[in-house]
UniProtKB/Swiss-Prot annotation:
Molecular function terms, GO-annotated: mRNA binding; structural constituent of ribosome
InterPro entries from the UniProt entry: Ribosomal_uL13, Ribosomal_uL13_bac-type, Ribosomal_uL13_sf
CDD domains attached to this UniProt entry: Ribosomal_L13 (cd00392)
Described function: This protein is one of the early assembly proteins of the 50S ribosomal subunit, although it is not seen to bind rRNA by itself. It is important during the early stages of 50S assembly.
Keyword Ribonucleoprotein: yes
Record-given protein name: Large ribosomal subunit protein uL13
Subunit annotation: Part of the 50S ribosomal subunit.
Record keywords: Ribonucleoprotein, Ribosomal protein
NCBIfam families: rplM_bact
Length: 154
């Protein structure tokens, strides 16, 4: 019997809604990365975009454990000599785009390549409680109920 290999035409995608309020960033990011890749399905095929579409709301209310809120640094380079820049997680969460902390955590758990970039397009992260995808009738996924450690104590 040959190993099952799913074709792109056979893929069935669902829409999943996750409320990130009070959830630990890393635990939520690993669960979402697995959903985006499709690894939670028995039909997972490494070279096919088999994952679900994920909508995350309240991304500005995520929790970082330990001292990561003040100590974790996000680096980027401007491209100019000496152009290394850094911001702490606190500065980003209190800044203009607080959802980027969660986006970066998920992005860094997905393989970097053409398929990974396509899978990241199936992710929608909103800082507030609203989203524009009611028409897709997303299924609500209660991440806090999956494991007691998923809920932060902040």
């Amino acid at each position: 019997m040959a190993t099952f290999s799913q074709k792109p035409a056979e893929v069935v995608k669902k829409w999943v809604l996750i409320d990130a309020e009070g959830l630990v960033v890393g635990r939520l990011a690993s669960l979402v990365a697995n959903r985006l890749r499709g690894k939670h399905k028995a039909t997972f095929t490494p070279h096919v975009d088999d994952g679900d579409n994920v909508i995350i709301i309240n991304a500005d209310k995520v929790v970082l454990t330990g001292k990561k809120y003040t100590d974790k640094k996000y680096y980027w380079h401007t491209g100019h000599p000496g152009g290394i820049k850094e911001r702490t997680a606190r500065q980003i969460l209190e800044g203009r785009f607080p959802e980027r902390v969660l986006e970066k955590a998920i992005e860094r758990m997905i393989p970097r390549g053409p398929l990974g970039r396509r899978q990241m397009k199936n992710l929608r992260v909103n800082a507030g409680p609203n989203h524009q995808h009611e028409a897709q009738q997303p299924e609500v996924l209660d991440v806090a109920a999956l494991n007691r450690k998923n809920k932060g104590n902040a």
